[in-house]
Amino acid sequence: MLHPEQAELRADATYSVGIHPWWTEDENINEIIKGFYFWATHPQVIRIGECGIDKLQGATEVEQERIFALHIELAEKLHKPLTIHCVKAFDRILALHKQLHPTQRWCIHGFRGKPELAQQLLATGIDLSFGVHYNEEAYALCPKERRFRETD
Protein backbone atom coordinates (compact mmCIF):
# COMPACT_ATOMS: atom_id res chain seq x y z
CA MET A 1 0.00 0.00 0.00
CA LEU A 2 1.28 3.44 -0.85
CA HIS A 3 1.95 5.89 1.90
CA PRO A 4 0.06 9.16 1.21
CA GLU A 5 3.28 11.14 0.71
CA GLN A 6 4.52 8.58 -1.85
CA ALA A 7 1.43 8.61 -4.02
CA GLU A 8 1.41 10.17 -7.43
CA LEU A 9 -2.14 9.73 -8.60
CA ARG A 10 -2.97 10.65 -12.16
CA ALA A 11 -5.39 13.56 -12.27
CA ASP A 12 -7.27 11.98 -15.19
CA ALA A 13 -7.82 8.60 -13.48
CA THR A 14 -10.13 7.06 -10.92
CA TYR A 15 -9.25 4.28 -8.52
CA SER A 16 -10.54 1.39 -6.45
CA VAL A 17 -8.99 0.56 -3.09
CA GLY A 18 -9.30 -2.51 -0.92
CA ILE A 19 -7.54 -5.25 0.99
CA HIS A 20 -7.46 -8.39 -1.13
CA PRO A 21 -8.18 -11.58 0.85
CA TRP A 22 -4.73 -12.92 -0.04
CA TRP A 23 -3.13 -10.13 2.00
CA THR A 24 -5.33 -10.52 5.09
CA GLU A 25 -2.73 -12.61 6.93
CA ASP A 26 -0.03 -9.94 6.57
CA GLU A 27 1.69 -9.26 9.90
CA ASN A 28 1.06 -5.53 9.37
CA ILE A 29 -2.68 -5.93 8.74
CA ASN A 30 -3.63 -3.19 11.23
CA GLU A 31 -1.41 -0.68 9.41
CA ILE A 32 -2.82 -1.85 6.09
CA ILE A 33 -6.35 -1.27 7.41
CA LYS A 34 -5.41 2.28 8.49
CA GLY A 35 -4.04 2.97 5.00
CA PHE A 36 -7.18 1.51 3.46
CA TYR A 37 -9.36 3.92 5.45
CA PHE A 38 -7.21 6.85 4.35
CA TRP A 39 -7.30 5.94 0.66
CA ALA A 40 -10.98 5.01 0.61
CA THR A 41 -11.93 8.62 1.33
CA HIS A 42 -9.75 10.05 -1.44
CA PRO A 43 -11.93 11.87 -4.02
CA GLN A 44 -10.43 9.90 -6.93
CA VAL A 45 -11.36 6.57 -5.33
CA ILE A 46 -14.76 5.65 -6.75
CA ARG A 47 -14.98 1.96 -5.73
CA ILE A 48 -14.11 -0.15 -2.71
CA GLY A 49 -12.31 -3.43 -3.34
CA GLU A 50 -11.11 -5.85 -4.39
CA CYS A 51 -12.05 -7.47 -1.10
CA GLY A 52 -13.90 -10.58 -0.01
CA ILE A 53 -13.42 -14.18 1.07
CA ASP A 54 -11.04 -16.79 -0.37
CA LYS A 55 -11.26 -20.21 1.28
CA LEU A 56 -8.05 -21.37 -0.40
CA GLN A 57 -5.68 -18.53 0.46
CA GLY A 58 -5.19 -15.79 3.04
CA ALA A 59 -6.07 -15.56 6.71
CA THR A 60 -8.72 -17.64 8.44
CA GLU A 61 -12.27 -17.30 7.17
CA VAL A 62 -13.20 -15.49 10.39
CA GLU A 63 -10.44 -12.91 9.88
CA GLN A 64 -11.22 -12.51 6.18
CA GLU A 65 -14.89 -11.98 6.98
CA ARG A 66 -14.00 -9.39 9.64
CA ILE A 67 -11.95 -7.42 7.11
CA PHE A 68 -14.61 -7.87 4.43
CA ALA A 69 -17.18 -6.44 6.87
CA LEU A 70 -15.01 -3.31 7.23
CA HIS A 71 -15.12 -2.89 3.45
CA ILE A 72 -18.90 -3.34 3.32
CA GLU A 73 -19.42 -0.82 6.11
CA LEU A 74 -17.15 1.74 4.49
CA ALA A 75 -18.69 1.25 1.03
CA GLU A 76 -22.09 2.02 2.52
CA LYS A 77 -20.83 5.01 4.51
CA LEU A 78 -18.99 6.53 1.53
CA HIS A 79 -21.66 5.56 -1.05
CA LYS A 80 -19.22 3.61 -3.22
CA PRO A 81 -19.79 0.27 -4.99
CA LEU A 82 -17.95 -2.85 -3.84
CA THR A 83 -15.76 -5.20 -5.93
CA ILE A 84 -15.59 -8.70 -4.45
CA HIS A 85 -13.03 -11.49 -4.74
CA CYS A 86 -14.75 -14.78 -3.91
CA VAL A 87 -13.30 -18.30 -3.95
CA LYS A 88 -15.50 -21.14 -2.69
CA ALA A 89 -17.48 -18.74 -0.48
CA PHE A 90 -20.47 -17.76 -2.61
CA ASP A 91 -22.86 -19.13 0.00
CA ARG A 92 -21.41 -16.70 2.55
CA ILE A 93 -21.40 -13.73 0.13
CA LEU A 94 -25.06 -14.39 -0.74
CA ALA A 95 -25.99 -14.73 2.94
CA LEU A 96 -24.23 -11.47 3.85
CA HIS A 97 -25.92 -9.61 1.00
CA LYS A 98 -29.35 -10.90 2.04
CA GLN A 99 -28.66 -10.13 5.71
CA LEU A 100 -27.24 -6.62 5.21
CA HIS A 101 -29.41 -5.33 2.33
CA PRO A 102 -26.64 -3.01 1.05
CA THR A 103 -27.62 0.13 -0.83
CA GLN A 104 -24.38 0.15 -2.82
CA ARG A 105 -23.79 -2.19 -5.77
CA TRP A 106 -21.76 -5.37 -5.23
CA CYS A 107 -19.87 -6.93 -8.13
CA ILE A 108 -18.08 -10.29 -8.23
CA HIS A 109 -14.63 -9.92 -9.80
CA GLY A 110 -13.47 -12.63 -12.22
CA PHE A 111 -16.71 -14.62 -12.18
CA ARG A 112 -16.21 -18.14 -13.63
CA GLY A 113 -19.22 -19.88 -12.16
CA LYS A 114 -22.01 -21.83 -13.77
CA PRO A 115 -25.24 -20.24 -15.04
CA GLU A 116 -27.18 -21.39 -11.97
CA LEU A 117 -24.84 -19.52 -9.64
CA ALA A 118 -24.88 -16.48 -11.93
CA GLN A 119 -28.69 -16.44 -11.78
CA GLN A 120 -28.63 -16.73 -8.00
CA LEU A 121 -26.18 -13.82 -7.64
CA LEU A 122 -28.05 -11.65 -10.13
CA ALA A 123 -31.40 -12.37 -8.43
CA THR A 124 -29.86 -11.24 -5.14
CA GLY A 125 -28.71 -7.97 -6.74
CA ILE A 126 -25.03 -8.78 -7.22
CA ASP A 127 -23.42 -7.84 -10.55
CA LEU A 128 -20.80 -9.93 -12.36
CA SER A 129 -17.43 -9.11 -13.89
CA PHE A 130 -15.87 -11.52 -16.39
CA GLY A 131 -12.17 -11.96 -17.08
CA VAL A 132 -10.38 -13.96 -19.77
CA HIS A 133 -11.80 -17.32 -18.63
CA TYR A 134 -15.52 -17.57 -18.00
CA ASN A 135 -18.61 -19.67 -18.62
CA GLU A 136 -20.24 -18.54 -21.90
CA GLU A 137 -23.75 -19.43 -20.70
CA ALA A 138 -23.34 -17.41 -17.51
CA TYR A 139 -22.04 -14.47 -19.52
CA ALA A 140 -24.94 -14.65 -21.98
CA LEU A 141 -27.64 -14.66 -19.31
CA CYS A 142 -26.17 -11.66 -17.48
CA PRO A 143 -27.87 -8.40 -18.57
CA LYS A 144 -25.45 -6.00 -20.28
CA GLU A 145 -26.02 -3.31 -17.67
CA ARG A 146 -25.03 -5.74 -14.90
CA ARG A 147 -21.96 -7.30 -16.51
CA PHE A 148 -18.41 -6.01 -16.76
CA ARG A 149 -15.32 -7.17 -18.67
CA GLU A 150 -11.87 -7.18 -17.11
CA THR A 151 -8.43 -6.53 -18.49
CA ASP A 152 -6.52 -8.32 -15.71
Spans of features found by a protein language model:
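Mid-domain alpha/beta scaffold segments of enzyme catalytic cores
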Residues: 1-151
